[in-house]
Amino acid sequence: MQMTFRWYGDSDPVTLEYIRQIPGVTGIVSAIYDIPVGEAWPYEKIVELKEKIENHGLSLSVIESVPVHEDIKLGLPTRDQYIENYKTTIRNLAKAGVKIVCYNFMPVFDWTRSSLDYALEDGSTALIYEEEKVRQMNPLHGELKLPGWDTSYEDGQLKNLFQQYQHMTEEDLWENLSYFIKAVIPAAENEQVKMAIHPDDPPWPIFGLPRIITNKENLERLIHLYDSSFNGLCLCSGSLGVKSTNDIPELIRYFGKKGKVNFVHLRNIKIIGEKSFQESSHRSEDGSLDMYEIVRALRDIDFAGPARPDHGRMIWGETGKPGYGLYDRALGAVYLNGMWETLTKEKKRIALECNK
């Protein structure tokens, strides 16, 4: 397993110099953030990003994300041009040596929370999702803006988008995802670029918008849309783990044995009610997920791909992008790597004893 770290480019207060100093972190997960959604990424800009990262002794391990244009999700006639642009981006990424692309198929909004700075008992602040508060929000009023959201929409555009999604069912969205997968995965396969779809976060409908990448059954359906190791998953423990019916270690073993786990997000969450949760430190005792069992499942399948510590709390007076500070994520990376080292050495010890 390669430990990686999310970096939001030159505007990120967490610099590459800082990331390079985290023990065990060797890769960067990033993207190009100044290209409008739907346009092809120029090869030159990809190389510029890659070289900047490599100049700091790190590798560009994953692109997260290449956003999927809403016309594709809506199934509009214009989707074919946007899909061609997407395929061009994949070809340019492959030419630059990038081999994994993370993406999602969530309508309009990316990951969603009700508050970005919920005060925890220890004095740190964290992201929180309270279903009742989200139900009372009107996203058209701009009450909340999150790091993963496309904020380029004007009020009229956002309202129009919601109207277009008004009558979309989950099956409609599945049909549009299938169209996208069957067009894009062959191109990715040809370029040897592994695609990794991120689960919906949270994994249930919000603001009346359908969400479909939510559980084992739907992940299984996704991988069968086009059967290829290049049509894989970004297995996010936090996104899926807020549903108590999602057994994360079991999902890792099940899809890992099929060769479908292409990328992993590791974080803990604390379930505080029905469809409500708060982010916690990565430590098992601080949340609802057993991070040891999750890492053990990855060790059991001999996972050799990239993983990253996901959202962290804001601690020690740090300010910056909510969920993406340096300190708590760095603690998470070292904690996760420590478990990985222990499990790896134990596995070798058992193998040696069995061979005596």
From Swiss-Prot:
Its cofactor is Fe(2+); Mn(2+). Its EC number is 4.2.1.8. The keyword Ion transport does not apply. Pfam families: UxuA (PF03786). GO terms for molecular function: ferrous iron binding; manganese ion binding; mannonate dehydratase activity. SUPFAM superfamilies: Xylose isomerase-like. Pathway: Carbohydrate metabolism; pentose and glucuronate interconversion. It catalyses: D-mannonate = 2-dehydro-3-deoxy-D-gluconate + H2O. It comes from the Bacteria. Keywords: Iron, Lyase, Manganese. GO terms for biological process: D-glucuronate catabolic process. Belongs to the mannonate dehydratase family. Catalyzes the dehydration of D-mannonate. This is Mannonate dehydratase 2. It comes from Bacillus licheniformis (strain ATCC 14580 / DSM 13 / JCM 2505 / CCUG 7422 / NBRC 12200 / NCIMB 9375 / NCTC 10341 / NRRL NRS-1264 / Gibson 46).
